[in-house]
């Protein structure tokens, strides 16, 4: 059984500090116990930053497409201080960015990196609600999927669900309607599981390949290295100080 996850960041953030991020939310008691660890860790990472200057999390509240773009940006770049996001405000190709305000840079970056897609009419709809499948599509692109455009067409949600299921991202959300608008705590759970998944690369000849398998230069044998976004960008490890394969 997997152990409780903790974070080891550049500033040596510990699990107790991560948990305190959750406890600091005035509405922490309203967070579903199943999703509490996800909220703990992502809030501790500053990927989720809460409302009212971090006082509330609003776990059952709907989340917007703009908010998810901001979260995916932080996970993908590790820029949790949003230091560079303004550089991408002009990257937007969508026609409805005039009212996007604070979210322009996040959306611009994610669109430029092909992590988010707009609608056929050329809009992004930043204030629109987002479904569980849409959240999964965004974060799975960050992991490396959709390079073969499998998240396009009428069956895109089915392909998203298949990949998410294969990677055990859905293990705690059985019975949840992922085609409905997603709550903030559900988004936290989906993202938390996804950032533990090995990143992949794609070639037409070989399809998707797990980049955690790398060649040892000394032995020329394949060895495993933790390639997940959580580990690469945030040094996310288990509570006993080991990575995904039990190594210190």
Segments the model singles out, each with a brief description of its role:
Residues 2-36, 49-104, 113-133, 140-181, ...:
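Feature responds to low-complexity, polar/acidic, surface-exposed segments characteristic
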Residues 39-49:
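Mature N-terminal segment immediately following signal peptide/propeptide cleavage
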Residues 185:
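Contiguous, function-dense segments enriched for cysteine-driven chemistry
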């Amino acid at each position: 059984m997997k152990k409780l996850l903790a974070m080891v960041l550049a500033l040596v953030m510990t699990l107790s500090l991560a948990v305190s991020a959750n406890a600091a939310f005035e509405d922490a008691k309203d967070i579903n116990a199943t999703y509490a660890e996800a909220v703990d860790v992502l809030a501790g990472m500053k990927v989720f930053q809460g409302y009212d200057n971090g006082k509330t999390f609003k776990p059952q509240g709907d989340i917007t497409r703009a908010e998810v773009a901001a979260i995916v940006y932080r996970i993908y770049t590790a820029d949790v201080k949003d230091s560079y996001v303004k550089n991408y405000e002009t990257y937007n190709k969508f026609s409805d960015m005039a009212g996007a305000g604070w979210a322009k840079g996040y959306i611009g970056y994610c669109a430029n990196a092909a992590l988010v897609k707009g609608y056929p009419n050329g809009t992004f709809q930043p204030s629109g609600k987002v479904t569980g499948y849409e959240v999964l599509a965004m974060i799975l692109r960050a992991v490396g999927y959709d390079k073969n455009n499998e998240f396009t067409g009428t069956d895109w949600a089915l392909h998203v669900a298949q990949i998410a299921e294969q990677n055990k991202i859905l293990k705690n959300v059985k019975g949840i309607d992922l085609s409905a608008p997603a709550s903030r705590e559900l988004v936290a759970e989906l993202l938390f599981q996804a950032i533990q998944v090995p990143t992949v690369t794609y070639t037409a000849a070989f399809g998707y390949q797990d980049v955690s398998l790398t060649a040892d230069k000394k032995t020329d044998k394949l060895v495993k290295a933790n390639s997940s976004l959580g580990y690469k960008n945030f040094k996310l490890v288990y509570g006993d100080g080991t990575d995904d394969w039990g190594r210190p």
